[in-house]
Regions:
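Short, flexible active-site-adjacent loop segments at beta-strand->alpha-helix junctions, enriched
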Residues: 52, 76, 133-135
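Short, conserved acidic/polar surface loops in the N-terminal third of protein domains
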Residues: 58-61, 81-84, 138-141
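Short, glycine/charge-rich beta-strand/loop segments that flank catalytic centers
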Residues: 51-53, 95-112
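N-terminal glycine-/serine-/threonine-rich phosphate-binding loop
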Residues: 2-9, 40
Length: 213
């Protein structure tokens, strides 16, 4: 379990001193794992994916990420889970962010708000939820634990795709005429992040047959 000390300015400043990274980015990454643990504690069934997932998957993640991306089965009733997770320390409220969808893909987005010890104002972590039957070749259980967060007692675990499965997923970002990001769509930073993740995953992937599948 995550210790309450994670959510203090002292801990964030310690991380800043050790890594020379932006304190707000460090803070938001730590609080993202607080949100991940919160939705796990309330029993929400989900698969954890996306850039922040790599911070659990990789022994030494190469970049920080601050959003939580999950997949849930179609028809999952999220409201009670989200409401209860939003009450767990250090969070203070939840607000659904309504976006216009495309390609008939069912998604919901939530801003989960906390009091920032670094900025001394309210900031949110974004929870992106995709409703679909997961198509990953292989899933693994991973404890919520990495070099940024302090833990105590038994670690909660989450289901995540294998390195090879998430690499295959990330590669779809470069299929702009199907499931990926359209070129010249003012999303250069998103493409760069995906490319960086792909390069990192290629270095540790072992079974490229699984990537293709």
């Amino acid at each position: 379990m995550l210790k309450k000390e994670n959510f203090t300015e002292e801990h964030i400043r310690d991380l800043q001193s050790a890594s020379h990274r932006d304190p707000l980015l460090l803070e938001r990454s730590v609080y993202a794992f607080g949100l991940l643990e919160a939705i796990t504690r309330v029993g929400m069934p989900f698969i954890f994916k996306g850039g922040t997932c790599l911070m659990l998957m990789l022994e030494r993640p190469m970049r920080l990420s601050t959003d939580i991306d999950i997949i849930v089965a179609p028809g999952t009733d999220l409201n009670t889970f989200i409401e209860e997770a939003g009450k767990i320390f250090p969070f203070v409220s939840v607000e659904e962010q309504v976006r216009k969808g495309k390609n008939n893909i069912e998604k919901r987005h939530f801003k989960v708000v906390y009091e920032s010890p670094v900025m001394e104002r309210r900031i949110y972590i974004l929870l992106d939820v995709l409703f679909e039957d997961a198509k990953y070749k292989r899933l693994i259980a991973k404890p919520i634990k990495n070099e940024l967060i302090l833990t105590d007692g038994e670690d909660l675990t989450v289901q995540i795709p294998s390195v090879e499965s998430i690499l295959g997923d990330k590669l779809t970002a470069f299929a702009p005429h199907t499931t990926g990001i359209l070129l010249n769509s003012n999303k250069d930073m998103e493409i760069i992040k995906q490319l960086y993740d792909v390069m990192t995953l290629i270095e540790v992937a072992e079974d490229f047959t699984e990537v293709r599948e």
